[in-house]
Amino acid sequence: EMCIRDRFASAFLDLNPELMAVIKESVDEIGLGGELRLERKAFSDGVLKGQRFLVDEGASESSNHTPWKVIRERLIQSGIKQEIRENALGIFKCLAEAEALVHGIDVEEVVFHEVGAVDSMVDVLAASVILDAYHEANWFLGSLPLGRGEVQTAHGKLPLPAPAVVELLKGFDFHDDGETGERVTPTGAAILRFLTESRGLSQKPETIKRKLLSSGQGFGSRKLKTKSNLLRVLVFGPEEKSPEEDRIRVLRFEVDD
């Protein structure tokens, strides 16, 4: 059964389909075993169109209790490109440190309960490939949706946003758009925290004139009441094209999921 993965990867695969081959290569290098299949699929919710990123675990490893130190060792021992590996280690480290803080344990004792080895590795590797592909870009982010309610976890019911998300996204701007449920996942929050620490991700409005080059839209699985469940990424280049400035300068994305 194909499972819909995160909107971050989906949006960038809509923007740049060629990234799929690099994501598959990186996932193969990690050696998750079994019959793991990755797929990008066009999707329309009847209002907007974009892409979904799908994963079929097949007979792959599937554990919902994965120690951080096991994931770290697996990444260190892998043959994936160094920059992609460092991105993945950085994202998982952000997540592990947040989990350690909220549960009052040592970071070396962190076990990821809510994400299986395959799920989390694919999401983080996909994000790591994307960050490497756009390593020269400046990153900007709109206000984040807050969400409300509770989520059932291995630790029982927890309030939303989940405690790890709150820890990861301290200092970020949020808004309440009236939608309930989880709006930013811990993995998504870890990607944003890592982008802030490693790429200077900002939520401040851009004041320099830029030329809009392209966009991508990634859809999640949940249906929201009042809006499309998507993340949109906009790519900007310099206002006036010149040979020495012929590259992407700015990536801005909005989370409406």
Q: What kind of feature is each model-predicted range?
A:
Residues 53, 119, 192:
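Divalent metal-coordination and catalytic microenvironments
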Residues 109-116, 188, 249:
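Long, contiguous binding/interaction regions
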Residues 12-13, 41-42, 111-118:
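Conserved short loop/turn motifs at secondary-structure junctions
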Residues 123:
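Active-site pocket-lining segments that scaffold enzyme catalytic pockets across diverse folds
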Residues 14-103, 162-165, 170-174, 179-189, ...:
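Glycine-rich nucleotide/cofactor/substrate-binding loop typically near the N-terminus or early
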